[in-house]
Amino acid sequence: MVRVRFAPSPTGYLHVGGARTALFNYLFAKHHGGKFILRIEDTDIARSEGIFEENLMKTLQWLGLNWDEGPDIGGSFGPYRQSERLNIYEEYAKKLIALDKAYEVFAYPEEIEEIREKLLSKGLTPHYDRTIFEPFATKERKREYEEKGLKPAIYFSMPRKAFIHNDLVKGTVQFSEGSVGDFAILRSNGIPTYNFACVVDDMLMQITHVIRGDDHLPNTVKQLALYEAFSARPPEIGHVSTILGPDGKKLSKRHGATSIEELRERGYLPQAVVNYLALLGWSSPDAKEIMSMQEMIERFSIDRLSKNPAIFDPAKLSWMNGQYIRSTNEEELEQLLKPLLEKWNFIPRNQDWLRRVIIAVKDRLHTLEDFQHVADFFFVKPEIKTETEYQIKCAMLECADKLESLDRSDKNSIVEVFRSTIKKQKVSAKEFYSTLRYVLTGKHEGPELVDIVFLLGPNEVAARIKSILG
């Protein structure tokens, strides 16, 4: 069975790149009828926070990426938090020592840093091996460690050989002999390093495939060596392309919202975000762009992942979000907009009226947040000043008087007031309606004017005309 994992560190909010990685793993697992596992890599004690872990889970659920095993629901291969697996890492580090494939290092951190600086000063890459650390493994130093209650770090003895990696996305990647020296797998405080914990966890959790960002490619040689040391078969690994901003530079905050939390707050729908992320480095075989989660699951395959960097285009995301807003019914949009209406202090007259407003403006929305400036005039009278031609002004004030005494408030009756007055006053219909739109909304464009007039109602329309032109 296919088993994949998404293994974030709870040190911040879920970024666009991380969310895409989670999505690709999810789509791959579901396409093959496999399992999607959530593992929390929280061994960075100083930066890991519970609030970020909670947000990661809520964000994944908001995106619809529900896991089959994880820290909250458990599973057959737990625990699913690395901080709860420290005894496991220690056990497997000792196994490598017993196999003479790892060794204890009694050098203090500052001594290791001194070695590093000396190598750099000689123009050498800081590669370590046993011989460098042997001078520190004296009886005196070991006794000193014991007296202080310290534990030695454990380093892996990197084989002096080349490694070949057959990447699911990039093809054959070769790591030359000596490209990596010995490296720490367990720190003196008992915390594992990333590559060691990753290999032990993937091995014990029976992960079959790993899809991750290409920034992890340099880690692959260390991980392949560790699998070999454990006589274990590594999972099949694929490295997906980097996400760049529209300017071709690595995606960052200067390109706008880059965390999923920010996108959610700005009124993007989860279906649109997921759909757009899927197209960052992957394409459907039928070139379809708007797809449901199920459609993406059915179409997804690793061989359609691109080797080239993907461009994150906020304008394309907004366009796609607009498509999803237009396909969402008014009842759902009403529920989605409720917290925003409270935030903006927009008080609807009643539920039916609000839904009619939503129908009038939804084609103009790219995000839910757009509702604030597209539909604000329905809730708040615009504060404007305008110089209006005398005849137009007279015609509009006459309309206001007629609207106040109107018996019926249906669309046809209201429109007839304007038509008859325009004809009687012999004014330009185009100029009249343009002025009316501005007087009622404070804008020169927007929803259909007939919808605006009907939703505001004859009394409100008359009041706005008189307050500005009277």
Curated annotation (Swiss-Prot):
Residues the record lists as binding ATP: K253
Disulphides: none
Catalysed transformations (reactions): tRNA(Glu) + L-glutamate + ATP = L-glutamyl-tRNA(Glu) + AMP + diphosphate
SUPFAM superfamilies tied to this protein: An anticodon-binding domain of class I aminoacyl-tRNA synthetases, Nucleotidylyl transferase
Pfam families noted in UniProt: Anticodon_2 (PF19269), tRNA-synt_1c (PF00749)
Keywords from the UniProt entry: Aminoacyl-tRNA synthetase, ATP-binding, Cytoplasm, Ligase, Nucleotide-binding, Protein biosynthesis
EC id: 6.1.1.17
Similarity comment: Belongs to the class-I aminoacyl-tRNA synthetase family. Glutamate--tRNA ligase type 1 subfamily.
NCBIfam families: gltX_bact
Complexes and interactors: Monomer.
Annotated protein name in UniProt: Glutamate--tRNA ligase 1
Species of provenance: Pseudothermotoga lettingae (strain ATCC BAA-301 / DSM 14385 / NBRC 107922 / TMO) (Thermotoga lettingae)
